[in-house]
């Protein structure tokens, strides 16, 4: 509800992130969807060992202030290697499905994908590709769809799909599609899809 005045403290307890990556991942991270059916005779067009008709579409959703997907650790450095296959372009993070961080209640920030910012360094091989969607929403609070925190090194962000943030309605709130914090490192951002922030 938009009015939380009648809710008890235990009703407003915050959950954690849906996905936390606090260790090294040599083969990269992919949030995938079934491939397009270009050849009806081929039941496994992406050659991943699973019949395409039996594959689902990745959806990661968090209600509350925690990031839907958090990559990094407070006590150690984290290295994300490249995802296999030419379609990944050598990138360590590929998002073909959807990620959403929804603050839900009034004054609770929303965070989609957060890399770094916890204390340890995070390196992502090649960068990241968004073919699907990464989004964040809030009710009168900050919202960031993608945030690179201090210590994050992501060579590039390639957006073919959508990175969107909605929320904040006051002069002090920040709504950002992509936020790059001090201490984060990125060489380029390319966009042939949509990157938006709406207050």
Q: Locations of the language-model features?
A:
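Surface-exposed loop/turn motifs in large extracellular/passenger domains
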Residues: 1-199
């Amino acid at each position: 509800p938009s009015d939380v005045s009648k809710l008890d403290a235990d009703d407003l307890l915050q959950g954690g992130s849906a996905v936390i990556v606090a260790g090294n991942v040599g083969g990269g991270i992919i949030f995938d969807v079934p491939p397009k059916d270009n050849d009806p005779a081929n039941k496994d067009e992406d050659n991943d060992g699973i019949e395409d008709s039996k594959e689902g579409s990745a959806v990661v959703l968090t209600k509350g202030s925690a990031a839907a997907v958090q990559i990094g650790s407070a006590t150690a450095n984290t290295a994300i290697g490249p995802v296999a296959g030419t379609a990944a372009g050598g990138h360590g993070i590929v998002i073909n499905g959807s990620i959403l961080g929804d603050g839900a209640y009034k004054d609770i920030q929303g965070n989609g994908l957060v890399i770094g910012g916890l204390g340890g360094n995070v390196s992502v091989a090649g960068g990241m590709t968004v073919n699907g969607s990464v989004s964040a929403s809030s009710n009168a609070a900050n919202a960031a769809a993608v945030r690179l925190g201090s210590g994050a090194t992501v060579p590039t962000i390639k957006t073919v799909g959508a990175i969107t943030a909605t929320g904040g309605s006051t002069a002090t709130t920040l709504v950002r599609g992509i936020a790059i914090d001090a201490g984060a490192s990125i060489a380029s951002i390319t966009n042939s899809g949509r990157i938006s922030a709406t207050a």
